[in-house]
Amino acid sequence: MTQFSRRSALLTGLALPGIVEAVCHVGASEDDDAKPKRFEELAGFEAAEVASKYPVAILPLGSLEFHGPHNPLGSDSIIVSGIAERVATRTKGLLMPPITFTQCPAHTAHFAGTVSVRPEVMTMYFADVLRNILRLGFRRVFILNGHDGNIGPGRGAIAEVADETKDAALLFASWWEFLSTETMRSLGMFQQANGGHGHGGPLETSAVAAFRPDLIHLDKAKDLPEPPDLSNGAPYFLQKASAKDWPGYSGYVSEASAEKGRKLVKISEDLIVKLVESWLSHGEAPGSW
C-alpha cells in the first residue's frame, strides 16, 4: 500500500476511512498552513464565498522590464509577489495572481525583454480586473505595487472604479515607498546619496536577491556613478523619450546582497502590514481623508 495512490484507491473502491486522508497528506509541507490562500488555486465551488471568508483581496502589480544585465526581467513582479504573499499571510487576505504585463516608460521600453502596455490600455484592463474582484463581493482591495510605471494607470483605474461603487474601498501602495531616502541613509547600507534607490540599483537588486538570489548576476554589471541631484530636494516628475547611452540600471550594484535585501524587505513588509491592518480595523488608512 505504500505506493497506493488516491486515484487507485477510488477506482478500486478501496477508499477506506483514513487511507485517502493519509495519502492526500503525503508530501505536504509543514509550512502549508503558514501560506496564504491563492485565488487561482480555489475550486469553482469556493469562488462564490470568498468575500465572506477573507477580509481583503490583495492584488500585486509587477512588470516585465529590463533592469540591467544583472537582474531578471521580472524583478518587479518577483519582489512584489514575495512581499504580497507575506502580507496576505499576516493579514489573512486572499492573494490574487499578479498583474505582470503593464506599462513601462519609454526609456526602458526599447531594451530587449521589456514588454510594455500602452497606459490607456493598462488603465482599462486594470479597471476591469478590479471590477471583477469587487463582483465577487469584496469591499476591500489592497493593490500592492512593484513598478513605478503602474502608478499613473493604477490611480486612474482606481478612481474610475471607486466612482462606480457605493461601499468599496481600494488601497494602493508601492513597496519601495516604505523605504524612504532618509530611512535608507540611516541604515547606511549603500553609499549613494539617495540610499540605493534607482532603477535596477543596489536596493532593488538586493530585494530581488532576497527572494531569488539564483537570478542575480552581479558579474554582468559594473558600478555606475550617481548622477548629480539638481532638484535641491524639490519634488518633480520628469519623463524622457529615451535615455541616451543609459545602460538600463543605476548605482553601485556591487553593494547589493541577499542579506541586505532580506532586511529591507522585512522593513517594508512590517510597515505595509501595519497600514493594511489599520485600514481594515478602522476603515481608513493613516493620513487619508
Model-derived segments and their meaning:
Residues 4, 10-142, 146-289:
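Extended, histidine- and acidic-residue-enriched regions that form the cofactor-binding/catalytic faces
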